[in-house]
Each structure stands twice: as structure tokens, then as C-alpha cells.
Amino acid sequence: MSRVSMFPTEDKRSYFERQRDQYIKNISASMEDVLNNLNALNRSLEHTVGLSQKSEELAEMWSHFYNTVNEDLVKTEDGDIEVDTTKE
């Protein structure tokens, strides 16, 4: 075997074909990066929505507690707050 056939030194493709293949590789790598970033964004948004729903539940619970406590309080003429003991 000749050494030239084992290790070809010149590419048989044209300059256009080599450049096209390089651009396709670059575009493919960029699209993969975009996909990975979109997946990370999606996970972040899902996490944010989950936290938002939990905070709404917590806010509703505190609102209910505040309204329940407020029903039993009465403001006196001098501005003090007292518990209304007349309700049963």
C-alpha cells in the first residue's frame, strides 16, 4: 500500500461544499444551544408559576384569618380596639 492512499492530504470536495458543511455544523450547534436555553427557561417559568400559586393560597389563608379576627374586634370612641363579646 502506498502511503498517499492511507492518508489523503487533499479534500476532494469543493470550497463551497466544505464551507456549506461548516455552516451546517455551526447552525446545528447553535440550534442545540437555543433548545437547551429554551428548556432552562421553561423550567424556570414552571418554577415561578408554582411559587405564584403557593403564594396565592397563602395570601388567601391570611386574608381569611384577618377577616375572621376583624369581625370580633370593635373600635371604641377613644380609638382603642376591644374584642366584641356580644356576638355568640
From Swiss-Prot:
Determine the domain of life of the protein's source.
Eukaryota
Q: Which Pfam families match?
A: DASH_Dad1
Would the keyword Nucleus turn up in this protein's UniProt record? yes
Its subcellular locations are:
Nucleus; Cytoplasm, Cytoskeleton, Spindle; Chromosome, Centromere, Kinetochore
Task: Spell out the InterPro entries in the cross-references.
Answer: DASH_Dad1
Oligomer and partners: Component of the DASH complex consisting of ASK1, DAD1, DAD2, DAD3, DAD4, DAM1, DUO1, HSK3, SPC19 and SPC34, with a stoichiometry of one copy of each subunit per complex. Multiple DASH complexes oligomerize to form a ring that encircles spindle microtubules and organizes the rod-like NDC80 complexes of the outer kinetochore. DASH complex oligomerization strengthens microtubule attachments. On cytoplasmic microtubules, DASH complexes appear to form patches instead of rings.
Known function: Component of the DASH complex that connects microtubules with kinetochores and couples microtubule depolymerisation to chromosome movement; it is involved in retrieving kinetochores to the spindle poles before their re-orientation on the spindle in early mitosis and allows microtubule depolymerization to pull chromosomes apart and resist detachment during anaphase.
Q: Which PANTHER family match?
A: DASH COMPLEX SUBUNIT DAD1 (PTHR28025:SF1)
Protein name listed in UniProt: DASH complex subunit DAD1
Gene it is expressed from: DAD1
